[in-house]
Amino acid sequence: MQVSDVEIRPYPYPYRAMLAICSDLDRTPDRFCYERIMRFCNTTAPTPMGDGVALEVGNSIYFSMPPDQFAYWNTDSTGRAMVRALIRSGHIDTLHSFGDWARTRTEAGAALDELSRHDCMLAVWVDHATAPTNF
């Protein structure tokens, strides 16, 4: 074999393609539903939607939303602990804006302070809406 016969594969052997999937929490009503979605996507455990599909699927989180939508500030301490654990494990990897009810830089700062206080980091920001905190 000559050096010219060697090439870098675009994907690690034996794979020929890649796919990234991220769930989006829009309209998720509460921590129970959020957890069921994550369990269905990431495990083989039985869920109300059927047996889990065992994919590695990330998700997003808001901080401040109306009471009928799951967000960090409007869930209970168990829900907030779940969010922090999912951030640390990499299953929540996206800040889906600070939320529709976060209206000031002070509120955005409080969310960032909360992440920092719990040693949680989200490197991805996404917002396909018109959140007031799109400064």
Question: What kind of region is each of these model predictions?
Answer:
Residues 1-135:
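Catalytic alpha-helical scaffold of carbohydrate-active enzymes acting on polysaccharides/glycoconjugates
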